[in-house]
From Swiss-Prot:
It is a peripheral membrane protein. The lineage of its organism: Bacteria, Bacillati, Actinomycetota, Actinomycetes, Mycobacteriales. Residues 943-955 have a biased composition (Basic residues). Its main location: membrane. This is Protein translocase subunit SecA. Its EC number is 7.4.2.8. The keyword Nucleotide-binding applies. GO terms for molecular function: ATP binding; protein-exporting ATPase activity. CDD domains: DEXDc_SecA, SF2_C_secA.
């Protein structure tokens, strides 16, 4: 973790920045009387006025006071919420590219309206990033009402949307979405085969809500797009049969803290007996080891109804951090298949990586980045170091009066939950609303059953019921309400005492068939009357709740991060309301088992305390803080390590994606190919003439290799002699120049041939398709090899070598080899692919269609010029090019130029689990895909993923 002194050092000058923000807020407030006098039409016309002034040279900083005043007034007129002074400060902090640290309940979503409106004036697009689809859609509708009133377009990116819908959403002035969706769209844009298929239009300005969750917690898990692997395997079910026969601490050991397993010799022997093999670790059987490890992990580390649920024959991951089911998302590296085998459901295909990027490197693409959170101070150093973001604490609108009670710790979980139920029943009887935070679906359902037995009316908010989330939250602050939530952190919803009037009013209007997006006029016309009616209903109840002590937040377990605990507590005591919080813990809690649990248990045993008598001591708080700090340190190290290794890939990815974009745009295609021909022929000649004199060179082998590359028009026998035993003096340079001239002449003839068959300019289109196809395939193969390299690079430490340095060095060599192979295969395809005119009904400008030439003509050459290999086979050529006249060129694994059957793997909201989402185009056919080793071998042999508006944020 960053040291406290470093954090303090980075926050030097904060006071001056806060004073500056106060002056800006004062200036904006002073403009209110002038703006209030404007009619709706005049207020709306301000947007075009600001755009004209921006085009004439005024900066956004100069427009800020007026633009903020206009957006503030529009918010008041449309949603009955006016930005407080501190929210204006927060908006200015965001515009200047900082993180605004605003406590829970201070109205971060409303604050975001100000910088989003201002920066949308520039016309480059504003991205508002949230933690889940629910919040993205809700905020785009809720705050979109304000932006639409001012003449701006708003849209939302949701999982499952088509490319056309995404393109339209990115064309809007302000686009809402999750970090995963924005990142996946960036990766997909760098997999497309046409400029028309691009969806994003640049990375100008982003506001990240819950910035600590997205940029810190989730940053240790990269975004990965993968597709079905080539090979297949049936071993998952076999090892799912064997796993129950293995006994913990006899056949294997488990480290819960590190979430790893280790197989003992006895376990290996049992597996060998079951499979009828002599040695599990010999080369032929080594792929089975990963199946064994995954089967044991599925048994010990992945629990049904906690980490996943089984619904309609499908294993669906549960984000334990938020309690949401993540439909379509899957674990990587065969883990999901192992769980499917364990649960005896259909086993879906394993995948190979097609594209990947870390969140750190994605968000660093933005020209200006900002964020909002209630808890960023402890991560100030990391945010500054990685993203160059300063953290500015924004004062609260009203003083906090919530009472945070000390933790109560019990010996057993059963005793803890009994005490929780007793506490809740007592508070329910006096009319105090209670919000209970649990860490899993299983625990929330257990508590629900206990409350039902005691006759306590309650609502459950977890992965199985989140469809009713808005209504449950809207009523969670009512007198006597009891709400069990799998986890509230990251939900971005306030629990308002007496009930949330905004959400209740919205639900009422939706029941009448009104909607802020599809029926905006009718919705806005009815809004004020319904809202006033609801406010009157909830006001009296809110007074009763305040008398009862406000919202009581009860946590049933501490989380890995103190920040998450604080977010749960922050649901109570918003905007100066009374409130209370307490955490109930037990020695059986996961955090206590992972760290320091045994020491506490021995103390409680020595004190001879009954199970139902808790202790409340500073020692407990210190132990918990120590455990949480250790987890935070571990996660920080993981994030740093991910970033170090991804920096190597990021440099390579930047080169490939820039090259790919140039090919898409058709920039100087002819010049690129001519240079490739020069490089490839030069490499062949240099390899063949590296040693000795002309009589020592194996020119026959060189010519054989060159003929598989292009139709050679000169005879080496004529160059070196007439065959009578004497050789002419010819230097390597002269030989090279002769062959280069011949190759370029051959390419000119090839271009004339192609243009004659398919029309003028067809050669450029063929070049574009071939280069894209080969580039994509070589990049995928390179990702395979880099992934494999990273898996084993840690062993270099045993040889006293720095694994990172070794990874950088070997990764650079592999990248260079990949680029050489790319040139060679591209030249071979361009010379040897058979081209014919496309059928008129399916013509694609400029009418190029490609079919394979003969196998001999399409054989591939080796990257090592001294020992040439055949060029790509006909099968490989067909994979690279497409097959029929109307088809675009496509690489292996792609269909008509478009990837299909994709899986999208990224971080959960806690950043802890690697998850994936199957693409809509994926076939439902179940197929086992092979191990990573099998896939690599196969690759070499072939050439080798509308909810209610946000609660009212009037502060």
């Amino acid at each position: 973790m960053p040291s406290l002194s470093l954090s303090k050092l980075l926050r030097v000058g904060e006071g001056r920045m806060v004073k500056r923000l106060k002056h800006i807020a004062d200036h904006v407030s002073s403009l209110s009387p002038e703006v209030e006098d404007l009619t709706d039409e005049q207020l709306r016309a301000k947007t075009e006025e600001f755009r004209a002034r921006y085009r004439d040279g005024e900066t956004l900083d100069e427009l800020l006071p007026e633009a903020f005043a206009v957006a503030r007034e529009a918010s008041w007129r449309v949603i009955d919420q006016r930005h407080f002074h501190v929210q204006i400060m927060g908006g200015a902090a965001l515009h200047f590219g900082n993180i605004a640290e605003m406590k829970t309940g201070e109205g971060k979503t409303l604050t975001c309206v100000l910088p989003a409106y201002l920066n949308a004036i520039a016309g480059d697009g504003v991205h508002v990033v949230t933690v889940n689809d629910y919040l993205a859609k809700r905020d785009s509708e809720w705050m979109g009402r304000v932006h639409r009133f001012l003449g701006l377009d708003t849209s939302v990116i949701l999982s499952g949307m088509s490319p056309a819908e995404r393109r339209a959403a990115y064309a809007a002035d302000i686009t809402y979405g999750t970090n995963n969706e924005f990142g996946f769209d960036y990766l997909r844009d760098n997999m497309t085969h046409s400029l028309d298929d691009l969806v994003q239009r640049g990375h100008s300005f982003a506001v990240v809500d819950e910035v600590d969750s997205i940029l810190i917690d989730e940053a240790r898990t990269p975004l990965i797009i993968s597709g079905p692997a080539d090979a297949s395997s049936k071993w998952y079910a076999e090892f799912a049969r064997i796993a129950p026969l293995l006994k913990r601490d006899v056949h294997y050991e488990v480290d819960i803290r590190k979430r790893t397993i280790g197989v003992h010799e006895a376990g290996v022997e049992l597996v060998e007996d079951q499979l009828g093999i002599d040695n599990l670790y010999e080369a032929a059987n080594s792929p089975l080891v990963s199946y064994l490890n995954n089967a044991i992990k599925a048994k010990e580390l992945y629990t049904k109804d906690k980490d996943y649920i089984v619904r309609e024959g499908e294993v669906i991951i549960v984000d334990e951090f938020t309690g949401r089911v993540l439909v379509g998302r899957r674990y990587n590296e065969g883990m999901h298949q192992a769980i499917e085998a364990k649960e005896k459901v259909e086993i879906k295909a394993e995948n190979q990586t097609l594209a990947t990027i870390t969140l750190q490197n994605y968000f660093r693409l933005y020209d200006k980045l900002s964020g909002m959170t209630g808890t960023a101070e402890t991560e100030a150093a990391e945010l500054h170091q990685i993203y160059n973001l300063g953290v500015i604490p924004i004062p609260t609108n009203r003083p906090m009066v919530r009472v945070d009670n000390g933790d109560l710790i019990y010996k057993t979980e059963e005793a803890k939950f009994d005490a929780v139920v007793d506490d809740v029943v007592e508070r329910h009887e006096k009319g105090q609303p209670v919000l209970i935070g649990t860490t899993s679906v299983e625990r929330s359902e257990y508590l629900s059953k206990q409350f039902t037995k005691r006759g306590v009316a309650h609502n459950v908010l977890n992965a199985k019921f989140h469809e009713q989330e808005a209504q449950i939250i809207a009523e969670a602050g009512r007198s006597g309400a009891v709400t069990v939530a799998t986890n509230m952190a990251g939900r971005g919803t306030d629990v308002v005492l007496g009930g949330n009037p905004d959400i209740i009013a919205d639900i009422a209007l939706r029941k009448q068939g009104l909607d802020p997006v599809h029926t905006p006029d009718d919705y806005e016309a009815a809004w004020d009357d319904v809202l006033d009616q609801v406010k009157a209903e909830v006001k009296a109840d809110a007074d009763k709740v305040r008398e009862a002590g406000g919202l009581y937040v009860l946590g049933t377990e501490r989380h890995e991060s103190r920040r998450i605990d604080n977010q749960l507590r922050g649901r109570s005591g918003r905007q100066g309301d009374p409130g209370e919080s307490r955490f109930y813990l037990s020695l059986g809690d996961e955090l206590m088992r992972r760290f320091n649990g045994a020491a506490l248990e021995s103390i409680m045993t020595r004190l001879n305390l009954p199970d139902d008598v808790p202790i409340e001591a500073k020692m407990v708080s210190k132990a918990i803080k120590s455990a949480q700090t250790q987890v935070e340190q571990q996660n920080f190290e993981i994030r740093k390590n991910v970033l170090k290794y991804d920096e190597v890939m990021n440099q390579q990815r930047t080169v490939i994606y820039n090259e790919r974009r140039q090919i898409l745009e058709g920039k100087d295609m002819e010049g690129q190919v001519e240079k490739m021909i020069t490089d490839v022929v030069t490499a062949y000649v240099d390899g063949a003439t590296a040693e000795g004199y002309v009589e020592d060179w194996d020119l026959e082998q060189l010519w054989t290799a060159l003929k598989t590359l292009y139709p050679v028009g000169v005879d080496y026998k004529e160059l070196v002699g007439d065959g009578d035993g004497e050789t002419n003096d010819i230097t390597a340079d002269e030989l090279r120049e002769t062959l280069l001239t011949d190759a370029h002449d051959a390419y000119a003839r090839r271009e004339a041939e192609i243009d004659g068959v398919a029309g003028a300019g067809s050669m450029r289109e063929l070049e574009r398709r071939v280069l894209l196809s080969v580039l994509d395939r070589k990049w995928r193969e390179h990702l395979y090899e880099m992934d494999y390299l990273k898996e084993g690079i840690g062993l270099r430490a045993m040889a006293q070598r720095d694994p990172l340095v070794e990874y950088q060095r070997e990764g650079f060599d592999m990248f260079g080899g990949m680029l050489e192979g790319l040139k060679e295969e591209s030249v071979g395809f361009l010379f040897n692919l058979q081209v014919e005119a496309a059928a008129p009904q399916a013509a694609q400008a400029p009418g190029v269609s490609v079919t394979a030439a003969s196998a001999a003509a399409t054989a591939a050459a080796s990257p090592a010029p001294a020992a040439p290999r055949p060029l790509p086979t006909q099968e490989a050529a067909q994979q690279a090019q497409g097959t029929a006249a109307p088809s675009a060129l496509r690489a292996k694994g792609l269909d008509d130029g478009e990837p299909r059957g994709l899986t999208y793997s990224g971080p959960a909201e806690d950043g802890n689990a690697q998850l994936s989402r199957r693409g809509a185009a994926e076939s439902d056919d179940a197929a086992d895909a092979g191990t990573r080793r099998q896939r690599r071998e196969a690759a070499r042999s072939q050439s080798k993923g509308k909810k209610a508006p946000r609660t009212k944020r009037k502060r």
